Amino acid sequence: HLAFEWDISEAVADGENAFAITVDNFRDRDGCPQEQFNWKNYGGIYRPFRLEYRPDIFIRDYLVFPRRENGKWFTDLEVTLSRKADCTLSVEMVSGDERQTAEIRFDGTDTATARLTFDSPAVWSPGDGLLSEVTLKLVCNAAVVDEAHDQFGFRTVETLGRDLLINGEKFQIRGASFHEQHPTFGNSVPGWQWTSDLKLLKHCGLNAVRAAHYPYSREFYAACDREGIVCFAELPCWQFDNYHFESPGVLEHCTGMAGKMIRQLGNHPSIIGWCIQNESATFEPKATGFFKSLHDVYKQNDPTRLTLSAESPEPPEHLAVVKKVSATPSGEAPLTSGFVDVFGVNNYAGWYGDKASYLPQLLDHVAGKITDKPIIVSEFGAEASAGVRSLTLPHYSEDYQSELLCRQIREILKRDFIAGFFIWLFFDYECSSISISGVNAKGIVDSHRNPKLAFNMIKNLLNP
């Protein structure tokens, strides 16, 4: 799910060259995601690729971390070169009408930092995707050997008690989860389609996306940046159990992936946090060290964003049948609640076993156990087969889905101690189980992005 590269210099000959790339999507129990997961994973290379000529010394990575202290904005820039060198890097940042420059000297090193201060930059905020620009030029032996140009955003994110703050102001998440999938494009969703999806999301009155359950293409996050949509990017630790917690190879794989996510996606202001896991067996004692290690990778390498854990405090019956995960001892809080910044509750009351009234009871119970951080409902929902309507509200009807979602949203909005929600999910997608004919139909629009009844009812609820 993340970008990768090969150095093919030794295979290139003078004249015309032909290259063939062989890939597979082999599933590995020690992988991330693990061997079993409930979404369709297409084979082949389904994201953009390019052939690139690089000099001996080039800009390997760069991250722009915006901060605000005492009313003053500044950026901390971190740059990594391909190897240690004696070079100079010129930096130019433009934000609104303001332009700042700096020069970084590499004296036999491959990493360097710089801080640039701004008086009144263009500030990125939810609903207002104001972006700034950074240009880097690497000069070695009086010659420009490499250049890089990117966009970033001035914004801050933090927590204050149970509140989530963006740019110092309280922000309530009203969102839905996505999967990286479209019936026409498969996993190769183009940027213009993502932009269309996000505009439809905003039309419904929603302001955030949980990009479940793996890193998406950069085109998706760039679209979120432009549209002012808040996003949580996610590490594919999906329903991990003691096997994964006890395997050093799994932890090494996941921590490496977390580091790559930061380096590849860290300049997107729409990403306000990293989700470290979904519905894993977090009550197992060995889970604490495993997920604390992942949390630490994110916080040590990116202190400007939050971490989220999406839990099943009371496991839905379907998960208990499929796999023994998150077996919650009565009255206990998941062990990840001790260190993550935001605690997520996944619960499908009204769909899998429990009555609809169970979700608000669960939220009140969780809030009594976790009092020092934001709590969000990270998943809730019901399936609806598009076009199925009935006054008797049977399962799989648009009417039942709409009634249940609106009821649960009202209960969430009544509770000031809940920092927001992510509906599961925005559009239907192909999956391997728990589905109608291989489709998870919990979307409030169908896979072709045609709205169901729930879309319009939620729109009316959130925009009275």
Feature annotation, model-predicted:
Residues 1-59, 84, 229-232:
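Accessory beta-strand-rich segments of carbohydrate-active enzymes
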Residues 2-6, 110-116:
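Short strand-edge motifs at loop-to-beta-strand transitions and within beta-strands
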Residues 4-8, 29-42, 157-354, 360-361, ...:
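Active-site mouth of glycoside hydrolases
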Residues 12-16, 118-131:
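Short glycine/proline/serine/threonine-rich loop/turn segments at secondary-structure transition edges
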Residues 49, 132, 168, 224, ...:
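Conserved, mostly hydrophobic/aromatic
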Residues 73-106, 114:
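Beta-strand-rich binding/interaction modules
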Residues 424-464:
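Aromatic-rich peripheral "rim/lid" segments of glycoside hydrolase catalytic domains that contact
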